[in-house]
Curated annotation (Swiss-Prot):
Taxonomic lineage from the root: Eukaryota, Metazoa, Chordata, Craniata, Vertebrata
Regions that span the bilayer: none
Compartment list: Cytoplasm, Cytoskeleton, Microtubule organizing center, Centrosome
Sections of the chain in a coiled coil: 234-645
Designated name of the protein: Leucine-rich repeat-containing protein 45
SMART domains in the cross-refs: LRR_RI (SM00368)
InterPro entries found in the cross-reference section: Centro_Cilium_Assembly, Leu-rich_rpt, LRR_dom_sf
Binding partners and assembly: Homomer.
SUPFAM superfamilies, sorted: RNI-like (SSF52047)
Start and stop residues of the LRR repeats: 87-108, 115-136, 145-166, 173-194, 201-223
Highest taxon of source: Eukaryota
Key words of the record: Coiled coil, Cytoplasm, Cytoskeleton, Leucine-rich repeat, Repeat
Length: 670
């Protein structure tokens, strides 16, 4: 506010002290979003400075310029500055006696400004200048942002009301219009009532103090009630559609998140399967290397077996040589028996000992040969068993690898099938949801259009009935007025005639009294004249009685007309009650439609809950598939552990066999 005050003082050659003091007071006040210069007489220079400052130098939400005595040029400069302003929401210009130039500037402001929501123009006499007010109404019709307009005490006549009605037909944002204490009259009220058939946004229209009939005021109030009900229904439907769209977007986000999580878990499972495949391939390669090592060990065992067979052949050769030596010794003994007979006993003993020793050695060598043969047989059996085990392990390994590959392929196929089925189910559910939403929206739009048509028809019928009622009332009033005028005329005429006759009789009586004084001698003549006068008086009385009877007949006619009027009014009331009953029936039908809308919303909620249950079922199926995958992984890990156990058992058996064979070779060497 201080910057605004300095800018104002800089722009004005002679700034107004009252304006500076008001700006200084407002700058010290806590609320700085309001420019309040009410009841300050602003000069033309001040208006020009404010018009230059308002577009961008100040950020005010409210501008109060009431009772400032603004001139035409000052108003033009101020409103020209507000045309490009985008922060002012409320403008107060009451009590400034705006004229044609001001009205045209207001129309231009309403055409160009897009931020003003409230405009107060009380006590300005805008309706006096028809051209300026028509320009203002054109600007109001082109504006789609103003929500509240105050036009109290502006001397607006029925022509101005017609211009306002034309503007309201084109305006789609104004919600409150105050036209109290103007001169709108019957024609202006009807024009405003007719414009309300096309304007559905106006919620409040004040017409007090405008000489507008009560039936038109009631019709305007009913139209306002219809507009308010329509706005509430539209706001409720918009809120519900926004809530439903948000829920649908949330469901879509949840579905996409769940699908992405599922894809991530599937990718992780694939990675784990690939890693387990790589690990199993590494283990298979390790087992292949172990088999190769076993083959090399078998080759070494075969070489050792050949060596043992060679050693066995050498031992047999030794046995053969020993047999030859035994035969040679026998021959030598036989040849030397003759020469050494003396030494025979001693040599016999020695020979027997040697023979026993040789026989023991021979039996020991035979036993060793048998033991070695048994070991060779056992080794051959063990080799065959190990070959069978190796072959069985190879078959088991190939079977397990084939089963693993088959299970992996089946798992991938199942995953692909589940993906396709899940995608298909998602697409089907999405298409069904879209179809249901479209059907509901179409049904709601059709029902809303039918309701609007019914409301318009009922409003037209109501307006026609009100016009007929007003016409009947006017006709009854005119007839009653005519009857009263005729009765008054008849009464006046009877009174005049009676007065004339009374005056005439009085004159005659006066003449008779004068004649009695003058003509006492003519008593008979006077008596005759008195008799004639009595006869005439009787005739006059009879005529007066006839007039009274005529008056009574006229009174009876008037009473009959009153009764007819009452019957007509009762008939109109009955018809109005019937129309009200029809309107209430239509209202009940509308309530039924609302209940149907609520039922449809409940069905939509049920469908959304079913959709959520289907999603939960899908999540359960996904969890079951995950559990199956986990069980398959557990089976694979168990089979891998069994293979590792078998490999370790085979390795231990081979190591035991190798250790046993090495012990056998060491014993043979010994």
């Amino acid at each position: 506010m201080e910057e605004f005050r300095r800018a104002y003082a800089k722009l004005c050659a002679a700034p107004q002290e009252a304006v500076l003091r008001r700006l200084r007071e407002r700058g010290e006040a806590p609320g700085r979003a309001r420019l309040d210069l009410a009841e300050q007489s602003l000069s033309l220079e001040t208006c020009g400075a404010l018009g230059r400052l308002l577009p961008g130098a100040a950020h005010f939400a409210e501008v109060a310029l009431g009772d400032c005595g603004l001139s035409e040029d000052g108003v033009k400069l101020l409103l020209h500055g507000l045309c490009s302003n985008s922060t002012v929401k409320s403008l107060d210009l009451k009590g400034n006696n705006l004229r044609t130039t001001g009205a045209e500037a207001l129309g231009k402001l309403l055409r160009q400004n897009k931020s003003i929501r409230s405009l107060i123009l009380e006590w300005n006499s805008l309706g006096v200048w028809e051209e300026g007010f028509s320009f203002f109404c054109q600007g109001l019709g082109a504006n789609n942002f103003l929500q509240r307009l105050d036009l109290r005490n502006n001397q607006i006549n029925h022509h101005g009301a017609g211009e306002l009605a034309m503007a309201l037909k084109r305006n789609a944002s104004l919600q409150e219009l105050d036209l109290r204490w103007n001169n709108i009259g019957l024609l202006g009220g009807r024009a405003l009532l007719n414009c309300l058939q096309s304007n559905k946004t106006l919620k409040k229209l004040e017409l007090a103090g405008n000489n507008v009939p009560s039936d038109i005021l009631k019709a305007v109030e009913q139209a306002m009630d219809h507009n308010r009900d329509r706005q509430t229904i539209l706001s409720e439907t918009q809120n519900r559609t926004s809530v439903l769209s948000k829920e649908i977007l949330n469901l879509k986000d949840e579905k996409t998140k769940q699908f992405l999580d599922l894809m991530d878990t599937i990718d992780k499972q694939r990675e784990e399967i690939a890693r387990s495949g790589r690990i199993s391939a590494g283990r298979v390669s390790q087992l292949q290397e172990a088999l190769n090592e076993q083959h090399s060990i078998m080759n070494s065992l075969k070489a050792k077996l050949q060596m043992t067979e060679a050693a066995l052949a050498l031992s047999e050769q030794k046995v053969h040589n020993l047999g030859e030596l035994l035969s040679a010794t026998k021959q030598e003994q036989a040849s030397m028996a003759e020469r050494h007979f003396a030494e025979l006993q001693q040599q016999k003993q020695e020979g027997a000992d040697r023979e026993g020793k040789l026989f023991r050695d021979l039996s020991a060598s035979n036993e060793k040969n048998l033991f070695l043969r048994n070991q060779v047989d056992e080794l051959e059996k063990k080799c065959k068993v190990q070959q069978d085990q190796i072959f069985q392990l190879k078959q088991d390994l190939t079977n397990t690898t084939a089963e693993l590959k088959l299970r992996a392929v089946q798992a991938e196929e199942r995953l692909e099938m589940e993906k396709r089925r899940f995608k298909q189910s998602l697409e089907d559910m999405e298409s069904l949801r879209l179809k249901e939403v479209d059907h509901l929206t179409q049904h709601m739009e059709a029902s809303e259009r039918s309701m609007q048509d019914r409301v318009q028809r009922l409003e037209a019928i109501r307006i026609a009935l009100e016009e007929e009622l007003s016409q009947v009332k006017a006709a009854a009033l005119t007839e009653r007025g005519h009857a009263e005028e005729e009765l008054i005329k008849v009464r006046n005429q009877a009174r005049l005639e009676e007065q004339q006759r009374v005056e005439h009789l009085e004159e005659k009586l006066r003449l008779m009294t004068e004649a009695r004084d003058e003509a006492q001698n003519c008593c008979l003549k006077q008596k005759q004249m008195v008799g004639e006068a009595q006869v005439k008086a009787n005739q006059l009385n009879l005529h007066a009685d006839g007039l009274r009877r005529r008056i009574e007949e006229l009174q009876q006619d008037l009473n009959s007309k009153e009764q007819e009027k009452v019957t007509e009014v009762n008939k109109v009331k009955v018809e109005l009650q019937e129309q009200i009953g029809h309107l209430q029936a239509e209202r009940t039908a509308q309530e039924g439609l609302r209940e149907k809308i609520a039922a449809l919303e409940r069905q939509l909620k049920v469908l959304s809950s079913n959709h959520r249950e289907a999603l939960l079922d899908k999540e359960g199926e996904i969890s079951m598939l995950m559990e199956k995958l986990r069980m398959k992984e557990a089976d694979i890990s168990r089979m891998k552990e069994e293979e590792a156990q078998r490999a370790s058992i085979l390795q231990n058996a081979i190591m035991a066999y190798v250790q046993g064979s090495s012990l056998g070779t060491h014993s043979l060497r010994k």
